[in-house]
């Protein structure tokens, strides 16, 4: 009945408290805490990658099964990203952040103590369900407390930390693995979760007053999501972003094989893969921000895709002609990440502008689709290709072609 009564109303979107209820500034300590919350997910994804082979040997399972500990985490992470924002709008930011961090910490301890592979898989699922809370709600906290240039500055700082985490995590994880064994990685994740839990409990106050909260209607939320999913142009744009970004998923899902078996490096050398990836993304993002007002959106997308095509073709050509080795095997990945960073922001804006009055809901779904495709590629496609650098390169090129086709179809729908 609630769905029927509200089906003709505007789609649900997050509305920040009125200016009179916002603080005039976000404290530096709060910014540091929020940045720390954005690290929870990337650390849980990337820190244990150097331990893949050791986990398989310890539990006597194949690399393909170990791969599913990443896939299960990503699927769980993507699923609850749809609901964390809505839950925090109804019950407040603080309870959801604290609850998700508590569950994440317990799940990390469970993974560290897992007596069998089945238990490890189960705890990774719970980890994934809990890890998205901080990443999603931290952005809402910024919107509660600040607006305009200050909000942009805080979000930029958070995104910088979010971008650095995947570069640091596998290096730290490799050191922990070599020094203390693979279980120490999950003890580290548990310690970080506990640190964030204590810090948020003591220093992060509630930012959404009770007067600004919404009633929780699961049926209405589901109906509103369905309205967005029925829009073909939005779906095409979201898929074009997700498939292009899944080039990362292919290499992250194959990271252990790519670094250790293909490149012949040690567990402590994962920086050879992740630092170029993150560097390309960071440089591309900085350039995109500087030229955003000077370059037309369609031109920005075209340049980004052109760079990605050159990178993907160079990657295929190199791995066809030569045996993969550093630094040449990772330079095309850096260039691909650079092009992706140029195209993705504009594609994201175009996707959200399909629903100009409901960008919050559209953003949640776009993030969900991106993470879902990332999980599918890293969990199902990567195991089919990760024995060969040439196959991985061809997989990235195939995904890029699909992304370009989706973007062109979305452009045609806009003209129609």
Ranges and model annotations:
Residues 51-80:
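Extracellular/periplasmic helix-loop-helix junction of adjacent transmembrane segments
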Residues 58-60, 92, 113-119, 130, ...:
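Helix-breaking motifs and short loop linkers at transmembrane-helix boundaries and internal kinks
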Residues 207-237:
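Juxtamembrane intracellular "pre-TM" segments in multi-pass secondary transporters
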Residues 123-164:
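Cytoplasmic helix-loop-helix junction between adjacent transmembrane helices
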Residues 95-109, 300-315:
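Structural signature of the two symmetry-related core transmembrane helices
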Residues 103, 107-110, 118-126, 327-333:
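Paired small-residue
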Residues 119, 148, 156-202:
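Helix-loop-helix hairpin linking two adjacent transmembrane segments in secondary transporters
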Residues 79-118:
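Conserved MFS/SLC helix-loop-helix module at the cytosolic interface between two early adjacent transmembrane helices
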């Amino acid at each position: 009945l609630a769905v029927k009564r509200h089906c003709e109303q505007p789609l649900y979107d997050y509305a920040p408290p009125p200016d009179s209820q916002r603080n005039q500034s976000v404290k530096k300590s709060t910014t540091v805490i929020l940045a720390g919350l954005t690290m929870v997910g990337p650390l849980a994804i990337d820190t244990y990658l150097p331990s893949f082979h050791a986990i398989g040997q310890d539990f006597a399972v194949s690399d393909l099964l170990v791969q599913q500990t990443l896939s299960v985490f990503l699927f769980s992470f993507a699923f609850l990203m749809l609901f964390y924002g809505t839950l925090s709008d109804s019950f407040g930011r603080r309870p959801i952040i604290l609850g998700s961090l508590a569950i994440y910490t317990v799940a990390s301890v469970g993974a560290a103590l897992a007596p069998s592979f089945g238990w490890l898989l189960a705890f990774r699922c719970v980890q994934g369900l809990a890890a998205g809370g901080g990443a999603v709600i931290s952005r809402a906290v910024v919107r509660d407390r600040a607006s305009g240039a200050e909000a942009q500055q805080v979000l930029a700082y958070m995104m910088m930390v979010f971008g650095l985490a995947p570069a640091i995590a596998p290096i730290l994880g490799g050191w922990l693995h070599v020094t203390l064994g693979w279980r120490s990685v999950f003890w580290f994740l548990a310690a970080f979760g506990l640190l964030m839990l204590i810090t948020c409990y003591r220093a992060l106050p509630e930012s959404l007053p009770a007067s600004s909260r919404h009633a929780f209607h699961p049926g209405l939320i589901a109906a509103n999501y369905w309205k967005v999913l029925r829009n073909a142009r939005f779906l095409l744009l979201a898929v074009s972003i997700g498939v292009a970004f899944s080039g990362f998923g292919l290499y992250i899902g194959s990271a252990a094989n790519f670094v250790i078996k293909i490149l012949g490096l040690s567990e402590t050398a994962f920086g050879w893969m992740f630092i170029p990836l993150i560097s390309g993304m960071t440089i591309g993002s900085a350039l995109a921000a500087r030229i955003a007002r000077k370059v037309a959106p369609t031109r920005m997308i075209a340049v980004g895709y052109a760079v990605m095509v050159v990178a993907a073709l160079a990657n295929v050509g190199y791995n066809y002609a030569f045996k993969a080795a550093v630094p040449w095997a990772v330079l095309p990945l850096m260039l691909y990440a650079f092009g992706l960073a140029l195209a993705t922001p504009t594609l994201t804006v175009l996707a959200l502008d399909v629903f100009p009055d409901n960008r919050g809901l559209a953003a949640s779904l776009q993030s969900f689709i991106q993470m879902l495709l990332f999980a599918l590629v890293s969990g199902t496609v990567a195991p089919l290709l990760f024995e060969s650098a040439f196959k991985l390169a061809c997989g990235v090129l195939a995904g890029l072609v699909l992304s370009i086709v989706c973007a062109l179809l979305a452009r045609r729908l806009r003209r129609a």
